[in-house]
């Protein structure tokens, strides 16, 4: 059975799936540098957990929220996959008291969005700016009638303006559209899916099944592994999480089939195996993941954030926020953050005030939405 983006399981099914889960950690040493990582067999009532210090709801009644990016004033832009709207959620200043619900407004509609299946308005990214200034543009990844593409949108601090395509022709399908984008200084990383055609992930002439690295005009970025190519890494099935650690290393989460989901450390020009291999392999020419979740019912990792030496992975089918300790290029044993609820989780991001923001994804057609879903949560985690 193919795992696309996360079929929904009821509470009983989730407990059975987790009870049977085998969580495989790929790495040589533990964070302490003494014990070798080994497989973990978590029981449904005994999986390791991390406690919350605080959880607040900062926004409600969002429709299939997908992308999340922060502006310099601490407010957040949120893309809604199925409506094409970009919403703005007020933030909080450093040192100000945490608020629960904050003001949410609509700043515009991204033109050309054709929502359907896993496609629609997906990732959103904000470039860095000097302190005290607003960005003049933002970036968005969307599915159109013909393709997936990335656009640059003028931004005046209040609303969306002119829209300019910078990368077009990314193959689209009902499933496996990728969609996460990430700004690093003057470079934009773009995660694409294989569009349901696995062999495209190994095709260097196709933009599908890749992580791309481009400048703000969509041209191949200086220093790319292949001159004149936008491709940074290849061999991906469906990457939907991208994050940089404190040393500037790029990490990614990737959906597998029913076999294994992955947390990967991305290195320029590396091949991550799909569809030749999935999960860990001894085959030459492919780079192994740092962590795998197997079976995929325990994860379906969509969002990724890195904060204070740990990766946080938002999972759809697993309905869990996973915390994975990082030390350099090594990844430790994942633990589930005790959120006190079970919801499909789409996106997690580190906020400027040191909190984590986390979006639920119960209105995406595969969940059981409540009357005020979807929500944006603000978390402080006991690490």
Predicted regions located by residue number:
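Acidic, Gly/Ser/Thr-rich repeat motifs that build Ca2+-stabilized beta-propeller blades
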Residues: 33-197, 249-256, 298-328, 333-338, ...
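Blade/loop signatures of beta-propeller domains
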Residues: 33-53, 95-98, 209, 219-225, ...
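Short edge-strand/loop segments of extracellular domains
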Residues: 145, 256-261, 265-272
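Loop-centered beta-sheet repeat module
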Residues: 205-215, 222-247
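Surface-exposed loop and turn segments in beta-propeller and other repeat-based domains
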Residues: 102-116, 163-177, 216-233, 271-296, ...
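Repeated scaffold domains used in trafficking and secretory/extracellular systems
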Residues: 344-347
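Hydrophobic core
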Residues: 24-29, 35
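N-terminal export and membrane-targeting signals
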Residues: 3-25
């Amino acid at each position: 059975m193919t795992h696309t983006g996360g079929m929904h399981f009821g509470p009983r099914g989730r407990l059975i799936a987790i009870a049977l889960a085998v969580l495989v950690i790929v790495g040589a040493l533990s964070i302490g540098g003494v014990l070798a990582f080994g497989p973990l067999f978590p029981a449904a009532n005994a999986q390791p957990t991390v406690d919350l210090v605080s959880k607040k709801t900062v926004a409600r009644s969002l429709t299939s929220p997908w992308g999340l990016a922060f502006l310099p004033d601490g407010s957040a832009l949120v893309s809604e996959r199925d409506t094409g709207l970009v919403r703005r959620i007020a933030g909080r200043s450093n040192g100000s008291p945490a608020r629960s619900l904050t003001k949410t407004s609509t700043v515009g509609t991204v033109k050309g969005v054709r929502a359907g299946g896993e496609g629609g308005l997906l990732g959103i990214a904000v470039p860095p700016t000097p302190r005290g200034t607003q960005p003049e543009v933002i970036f968005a990844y969307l599915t159109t009638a013909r393709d997936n593409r990335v656009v640059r949108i003028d931004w005046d601090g209040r609303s969306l303006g002119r829209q300019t395509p910078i990368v077009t022709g990314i193959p689209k399908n009902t499933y496996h559209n990728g969609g996460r984008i990430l700004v690093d200084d003057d470079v934009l990383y773009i995660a694409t899916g294989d569009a349901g055609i696995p062999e495209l992930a190994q095709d260097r002439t196709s933009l599908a099944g890749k992580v791309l690295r481009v400048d703000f005009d969509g041209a191949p970025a200086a220093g790319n592994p292949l001159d004149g190519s936008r491709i940074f890494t290849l061999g991906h099935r469906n990457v939907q999480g991208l994050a940089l650690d404190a040393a500037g290393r790029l990490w990614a989460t990737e959906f597998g089939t029913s076999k294994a989901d992955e947390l990967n450390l991305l290195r320029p020009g590396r091949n991550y195996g799909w569809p030749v291999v999935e999960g860990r392999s001894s085959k030459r020419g492919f780079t192994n993941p740092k962590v795998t979740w197997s079976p995929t019912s325990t994860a379906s990792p969509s969002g990724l954030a890195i904060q204070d030496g740990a990766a946080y992975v938002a999972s759809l089918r697993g309905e869990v926020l996973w915390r994975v300790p990082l030390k350099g290029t090594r990844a430790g044993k994942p633990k589930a953050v005790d959120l006190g609820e079970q919801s499909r989780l789409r996106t997690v991001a580190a906020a400027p005030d040191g909190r984590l923001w986390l979006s639920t994804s119960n209105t995406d057609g595969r969940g059981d939405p409540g009357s005020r879903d979807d929500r944006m949560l603000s978390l402080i985690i006991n690490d």
